[in-house]
UniProtKB/Swiss-Prot annotation:
Cited function: Required for accurate and efficient protein synthesis under certain stress conditions. May act as a fidelity factor of the translation reaction, by catalyzing a one-codon backward translocation of tRNAs on improperly translocated ribosomes. Back-translocation proceeds from a post-translocation (POST) complex to a pre-translocation (PRE) complex, thus giving elongation factor G a second chance to translocate the tRNAs correctly. Binds to ribosomes in a GTP-dependent manner.
Domain tr-type G stretches: 7-189
Gene from which the chain derives: lepA
GO CC, alphabetical: plasma membrane
Enzyme Commission (EC) number: 3.6.5.n1
Membrane topology value: Peripheral membrane protein
Family: Belongs to the TRAFAC class translation factor GTPase superfamily. Classic translation factor GTPase family. LepA subfamily.
Protein name: Elongation factor 4
Principal location: membrane
Residues where GTP binds: D19, H20, G21, K22, S23, T24, N136, K137, I138, D139
Domain of life: Bacteria
GO BP terms, alphabetized: positive regulation of translation; translation
Length: 603
């Protein structure tokens, strides 16, 4: 490894919207600097999980150290710190930006600026990063670099006269990008003599070494064998292994201010070394931790149940293993009368939920039932403390509570002008409050709405994409809780409430949702030997009901002619039997019924 003085280190990240070519650009940089040998090169080199490759998104952060000889003949060390581009992971993005001094803003020359790019650029500006605009995919026939340059200048206010024209796929403009990193990104501050402070920007669990922590040294020096303390959790560890990532791990003896590396210190779980925590020496600790640390707060909750009750322990183990790698995932055991034993899980957002679900099914071969996602409500009871609930079935009765508040988010949608009407209609049907509308360019518009988070977690994103033919993009952030007339909608099957189908809905929408739910269930629950009523109720008031008629055997088949009383006797006997059955019989609710409830909101 080249030893580099602080003045020749450059730490940068790449900001880009999904599909604008960030991973391909990272591949080219690794190749051009000779960090990864040509024969080892594969597409999306830094995206390690199969899921990341398949969806073409970056989920976990990666880092890579590149040695680069500049045109001035000096040897530089460039540290690329990768960021996830999706809104669910914005805290991780802010931590990895805090570890950098500069950022490449990669924009697709045929598409222009998207909502998530904007959100991340603002984050980068908050951290005072030097931003270098790069127009990617200029080899495409539909590329309009001049229009996109103007768009970046108008929307973000960045001077684009020096923007690099590039095509990561064809390898055009890569040399210019490397030179502009060296000349424009400022070197880290030279604080080698101060007490050690290092920022954790990612960590993952390795079955042999425990948790491996990726960090950037902000002040001071760290050596192999040092005893370190994590300032937020207060725990102390001895460093077993210290090294740099070129993307493969290479051990080194020490790292100083400005450098990026990894360490292993027999840490048991990722929750002990959280993203954003500060590492310092146990013997000579720093006075204050680095700013900006936050606990990850789940926003979306759902129940996960194994379809086969015997798999409950397997599900517990799988969640424990995922939790080792994913500090934002929360779960606790839960039982449901309809589904048996399972877990109530909390996620950062919908994408995070889908990814966890997919990893459980794919990597651990589990068959899962997922209940409808819900958000965290704040309930003020008549007596006692305010408390939070994430499961609709635990909501207290109206006579015991004063008010319910739900979380609201501010949503920014960037869309071509043609789709403004249909997206405004979508936001209004989801109880959105219109706040602002800005024209970014004559063709592109930003719509700003305030919406309840509960209206977004189901399928708002999919609806927005389908209404705008895939051209709109969105970004949201929490703005606090607001009181609304919310009610708990219970679904009763054969007079028994099914807890997994309960939902908290707005009073004005309760009838529509209840009616749709019962008619859907009527189609899906198979007929039994007795009549099954299906009802949607608020408290004790039934607002919608359907019934599934009983299957009947033709008991009169053996009577040809004969007396009517004989027939009546047989029919009465059948009726009495059905009545007895209804009292003791239990109704089988098939798996599809629960899935249909999830899909119901899409229709």
């Amino acid at each position: 490894m080249t030893e580099a003085p602080v003045s020749r280190i450059r730490n940068f990240s790449i900001i880009a919207h999904i599909d604008h070519g960030k991973s391909t650009l990272a591949d080219r940089l690794l190749q051009t600097t000779g960090t990864v040998a040509a024969r080892d090169m594969k597409e999306q080199f830094l995206d390690n999980m199969d899921l990341e490759r398949e969806r073409g998104i970056t989920i976990k952060l990666q880092a890579a150290r590149m040695n680069y000889r500049g045109e001035d003949g000096e040897e530089y060390v460039l540290n690329l710190i990768d960021t996830p581009g999706h809104v669910d992971f914005s805290y991780e993005v802010s931590r990895s930006l805090a570890a950098c001094e500069g950022a490449l803003l990669v924009v697709d020359a045929s598409q222009g600026v998207e909502a998530q790019t904007l959100a991340n650029v603002y984050l980068a500006l908050e951290h005072n990063l030097e931003i270098i605009p790069v127009l990617n995919k200029i080899d495409l026939p539909g590329a309009e670099p001049e229009r996109v340059k103007q768009e970046i200048e108008e929307i973000i206010g960045l001077d684009c006269s020096g923007a690099v024209m590039a095509s990561a796929k064809e390898g055009i403009g890569i040399a210019e990008i490397l030179e502009s990193i060296v000349h424009l990104v400022p070197p880290p501050q030279d604080t080698v003599s101060e007490p050690l402070r290092a920022l954790i920007f990612d960590s993952y669990y390795d079955p042999y070494r425990g948790v491996v922590v990726y960090f950037r040294v902000m002040d001071g020096t760290v050596k192999q064998g040092d005893k370190i303390r994590l300032m937020a959790s207060g725990k102390e560890y001895q460093i077993d292994e210290l090294g740099v990532l070129s993307p493969a791990q290479v051990q080194v003896k020490e790292l100083h201010a400005g450098e990026v590396g990894y360490l292993a210190a027999a840490i048991k779980a990722v929750t002990d070394a959280r993203v954003g925590d500060t590492i310092t020496l146990a013997t000579a600790p720093a006075k204050t931790p680095l700013p900006g640390y936050e606990e990850a707060k789940p926003m979306v909750f759902c129940g996960m149940f194994p379809t086969d009750a015997d798999q409950f322990e397997d599900l517990r183990e799988a969640l424990e293993k995922l939790r080792l790698n994913d500090a934002a995932l929360q779960y606790e055991p839960e039982t449901s009368s309809a589904m048996g034993f399972g877990f109530r899980c909390g996620f950062l957002g919908l994408l995070h939920m889908e990814i966890v679900q997919e990893r459980l099914e794919r990597e651990y071969n589990l068959d899962l039932i997922i209940t409808a996602p819900s958000v965290v409500y704040r309930v003020t009871p008549l007596k006692g403390e305010v408390f939070m609930i994430d499961n609709p079935s635990t909501l207290p009765d109206p006579q015991h509570r004063e008010k319910i508040e739900e979380p609201y988010v501010q949503v920014e949608m960037i869309t071509p002008e043609t789709y403004v009407g249909t997206l405004m209609e979508l936001a209004q049907t989801r109880r959105g409050v219109f706040k602002d509308m800005k024209y970014l360019t004559p063709e592109r518009t930003t719509l700003i709405y305030e919406l309840p988070l509960a209206e977004i977690v189901t399928d708002f994103f999919d609806q927005m994409k389908s209404r705008s033919r895939g051209y709109a993009s969105m970004e949201y952030q929490l703005i606090g809780y607001r009181e609304n007339p919310l009610v708990k909608l219970d679904i009763l099957i054969n007079s028994d409430p099914v807890d997994s189908l309960a939902a908290i809905v707005h009073r004005d929408k309760a009838y529509g949702v209840g009616r749709a739910l019962v008619s859907k269930l009527r189609e899906l629950i198979p007929r039994h030997q007795f009549k099954i009523p299906i009802q949607a109720a608020i408290g004790s008031k039934v607002i919608a009901s359907e019934s599934i008629p009983a299957l009947r055997k033709d008991v009169l088949a053996k009577c040809y002619g004969g007396d009517i009383t004989r027939k009546k006797k047989l029919l009465e006997k059948q009726k009495a039997g059905k009545k007895r059955m209804k009292a003791v019989g239990s109704v089988d609710v098939p798996q599809e019924a629960f899935m249909a409830v999830l899909r119901l909101k899409d229709e």
